[in-house]
């Protein structure tokens, strides 16, 4: 006894539906053109990159910022402490705050001037190192100048 299916047509499977849209637009073509150097062309400049400040210049700038921030922080802290200290006279804290602000602006200007002075020495030293491939012996003069500037700045 043979088995029969009952129909002569094969069973068709349903195709899965496509979930993304089909596009007939082609991707843009970017022709890669390579320039052939001619006999008169100049080679590309190797030093055309922008230079970042050196490590010592960044340290000097950071030190100047720390000094200014410290001065302002101490002044504000002293002012807030003076407000809550409970002194009987109101005019004395106001005068003291004005005097502290005057001292702070003077210190800030001095700190900025010293920071700028040492920043110049730091730039000179790092420039020398860059030009001489990091040779400290050649740049010792600039290193001594930077150390002297930093020592002078510590006294203030």
UniProtKB/Swiss-Prot annotation:
Compositionally biased region (Polar residues): 84-110
Keyword Disulfide bond belongs to the record: yes
Transit peptide: first to last position: 1-21
Transmembrane residue ranges: none
Low complexity bias: start-end ranges: 1-21
Places the protein is found: Mitochondrion intermembrane space
One Gene Ontology cellular component annotation held by this UniProt entry: cytoplasm
Annotated GO biological process: aerobic respiration; mitochondrion organization
Domain CHCH intervals: 115-156
Region described as Disordered: 1-50, 78-110
Keywords noted in UniProt: Disulfide bond, Mitochondrion, Transit peptide
Residue numbers covered by motif Cx9C motif: 118-128
Disulfide bonds: 118-149, 128-139
Additional facts recorded: Present with 6960 molecules/cell in log phase SD medium.
PANTHER family associated with the record: COILED-COIL-HELIX-COILED-COIL-HELIX DOMAIN CONTAINING 2, ISOFORM A-RELATED, COILED-COIL-HELIX-COILED-COIL-HELIX DOMAIN CONTAINING 2/NUR77
Full protein name: Mitochondrial intermembrane space cysteine motif-containing protein MIX17
Provenance organism: Saccharomyces cerevisiae (strain ATCC 204508 / S288c) (Baker's yeast)
Biological classification of the source: Eukaryota, Fungi, Dikarya, Ascomycota, Saccharomycotina
